[in-house]
């Protein structure tokens, strides 16, 4: 039992490290005025999932994405924009090295996966909750997220999700 507890702690600690690396990457790019490509950000998220097979999704949500990306002009038809044109990518590992790409809903500070990170201004872990993916699939998951803070203002949140099924399988 103790070894399982240690293994689970290692997974959670690793997940927190992943989220910290995501937020550090984004904040550093903003502070150094480095324009990241949206495609590069998607690849970064895919690599996170590839290197951490217990994770289900990696995502980034912005209240204001103009700190990092040029404004959406409608010409890019990739599925990582909200209806208002904000870059909010959600990459999901669907097995066999394949990934689905969609956008998060419009940034709402009260959404369960954003709320704790926005309010605490630090890495947060949610209680398990049910989330409906764009294809209608409902998944019981938990989120580890961290705020993107520029000039003491939360402009977005990065995060990863893991399913409770994955945690149960690890035990």
Walk through the language-model features, giving the residues of each.
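Amphipathic alpha-helical bundle/coiled-coil segments
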Residues: 5, 9, 49, 106-111, ...
């Amino acid at each position: 039992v103790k070894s399982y507890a240690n293994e689970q702690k290692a997974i959670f600690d690793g997940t927190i490290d992943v989220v910290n690396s995501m937020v550090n990457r984004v904040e550093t790019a903003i502070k150094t005025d480095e324009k990241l490509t949206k495609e590069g950000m998607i690849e970064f998220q895919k690599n996170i999932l590839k290197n951490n097979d217990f994770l289900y999704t990696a995502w980034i949500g912005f209240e204001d994405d103009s700190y990092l990306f040029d404004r959406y002009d409608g010409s890019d038809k990739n599925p990582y924009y909200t209806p208002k044109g904000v870059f909010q990518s959600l990459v999901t590992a669907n097995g066999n090295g394949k990934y689905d790409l969609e956008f998060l809903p419009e940034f709402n500070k009260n959404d369960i996966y954003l709320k704790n990170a926005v309010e605490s201004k630090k890495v947060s872990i949610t209680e398990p909750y049910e989330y409906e993916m764009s294809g209608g699939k409902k998944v019981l998951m938990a989120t580890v997220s961290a705020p993107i803070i520029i000039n003491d203002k939360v402009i977005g949140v990065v995060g990863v999700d893991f399913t409770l099924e994955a945690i149960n399988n690890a035990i």
